[in-house]
Amino acid sequence: MEQSIIEGVPGRYWHRLEDGRIQCDVCPRYCKLHEGQRGLCFVRARQNDQMLLTTYGRSSGFCIDPIEKKPLNHFLPGTPVLSFGTAGCNLTCKFCQNWDISKARALDRVQDKASPEAIAEAAVRSGCRSVAFTYNDPVIFLEYAIDVAQACRARGIKTVAVSAGYIAPEPRVEFFGHMDVANIDLKGFTEGFYKTLCSGKLSSVLETLEYLKHETNVWFEITTLLIPGENDSADEIEAESRWVMDRLGPDVPLHFTAFHPDWKMLDTPPTPPQTLKMARRIAIEAGLRYVYTGNIHDSVGQSTYCHGCGTTLIGRDWYDLTAWNLTADGRCGDCGVPCAGVFDAGHGYWGARRQPVRVQAVANS
């Protein structure tokens, strides 16, 4: 049992149990803690008989990315987004592509410090249209994320949650009530996959997706990392695609991205490009209008097409925009059919750059 806990701020969503433990109610794990213990996420801890968030105001680093890297293809294309994460995660994915951050167990990994107001100010001064909570799941630092979102909204900056959607019903309402945009990682489409490789439950993620679609105005897209031999069968891809079509509708963008050997799955080979292209074809045949490939060079699979006439609406080459055929109100320039998403009259010009940022320095400049 760990007795030394770093400073933190009081956390929300917990209650006392009759046996003296306290239960964290942020995610479906419902960790039950004695004094001095941390939850599985590592950043929510019991100290002095209350729940603390130990990473408030601390980050593993800030960087300006292209919005397409989140990935988000239907939200202010071409614009820069100020991205950051903290440490820890409430899933245990053996294939984690950001394991050095999400699996961090030494809080010296989060040395960059910034207040919510400083982050919002840095976004404005850097010309970013949005701030993204990414690299690790913002659900576990929801108090910090919500405060940042409120500061950003006051400055006209949108907020983006890149999340696995593994959150309990009550905090789900508050958390997404402060977000403008989300990309939800739908990691597989069987309970066996979630249990074996993530120590989680598929059903909880599907509940989040249906909540976002039917009970919020959050623009969201879905990403599935296809792992050879684990979640890449044609049957599973078809089942996922049909579920998205039936429960969420044809306009929710779906990204199939390539796995590379990492964390505890170093012996698993990278995803072949043909698997991603197969998945895209299956999803389109299921009725989805906006299906993308990622982590490979595939300009066809990364571009956006009109579902009315088939013309290219947004051409992409990696993170660079190569074509734009949308009207000021987000319609096809050829046939006038609307394209689902959040668009300006034109696109941004950030390109593929990735620029590290010292938030306090920028905010104080």
Regions picked out by a protein language model, each given a short descriptive name:
Residues 24, 33, 42-43, 54-58, ...:
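Generic structural "secondary-structure junction" signal
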Residues 30-54, 98-108, 315-319, 339-346:
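Iron-sulfur (Fe-S) cluster-binding segments and ferredoxin-like electron-carrier domains
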Residues 113-274, 279:
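Conserved AdoMet/S-adenosylmethionine-binding subsite of the radical SAM
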Residues 46-181, 350-358:
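Conserved Radical SAM active-site core
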Residues 1-35, 229-365:
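Auxiliary Fe-S-binding modules of radical SAM enzymes
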Residues 26, 40-43, 88-91, 95, ...:
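Short, cysteine/histidine-rich loop/knuckle motifs that typically chelate Zn2+
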